């Protein structure tokens, strides 16, 4: 169930401060964050945000189409390596 519109977007305060500081200074270094739950807002457009996926920080370049989505959607946490192959078919 999506978040109610009357509540507005959620963004962690520490991330908001980092984003405002990066926009103000014009810094192009990625903004590191562990806050996967924060929503992407228009202030973040053009920034690279390094989102933690549980093992490392995945760089995410924010574009207009991403507004309203959560940061965690763009940093996958699981790696899919495929199903186990049939051993008999492999030998041939």
Swiss-Prot record:
Q: Which GO terms describe its biological process?
A: ribosomal small subunit assembly; translation
A cellular-component GO term for this protein: small ribosomal subunit
List where this protein forms a coiled coil.
Answer: none
Q: Is Ribosomal protein among the key words of this record? A: yes
Any single GO molecular-function term of the entry would be:
rRNA binding
User: What InterPro entries does its record include?
Assistant: Ribosomal_uS19, Ribosomal_uS19_bac-type, Ribosomal_uS19_CS, Ribosomal_uS19_SF
Listed A to Z, the keywords are:
Ribonucleoprotein, Ribosomal protein, RNA-binding, rRNA-binding
Under SUPFAM superfamilies, the record lists: Ribosomal protein S19
Source organism superkingdom: Bacteria
Q: Known NCBIfam families for this protein?
A: rpsS_bact
Described by its record, this protein's role is as follows: Protein S19 forms a complex with S13 that binds strongly to the 16S ribosomal RNA.
Name the family. Answer: Belongs to the universal ribosomal protein uS19 family.
Record's protein name: Small ribosomal subunit protein uS19
The record lists the organism as Aeromonas hydrophila subsp. hydrophila (strain ATCC 7966 / DSM 30187 / BCRC 13018 / CCUG 14551 / JCM 1027 / KCTC 2358 / NCIMB 9240 / NCTC 8049)
């Amino acid at each position: 169930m999506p978040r109610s519109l009357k509540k507005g977007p959620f963004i962690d305060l520490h991330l908001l401060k980092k984003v405002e500081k990066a926009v103000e200074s014009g810094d192009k270094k990625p903004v590191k964050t562990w806050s996967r739950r924060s929503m992407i807002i228009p202030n973040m457009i053009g920034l690279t945000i390094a989102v933690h996926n549980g093992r490392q920080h995945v760089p995410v370049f924010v574009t207009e189409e991403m507004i309203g989505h959560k940061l965690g959607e763009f940093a996958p946490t699981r790696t899919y390596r495929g199903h186990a192959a049939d051993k008999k078919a492999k030998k041939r």
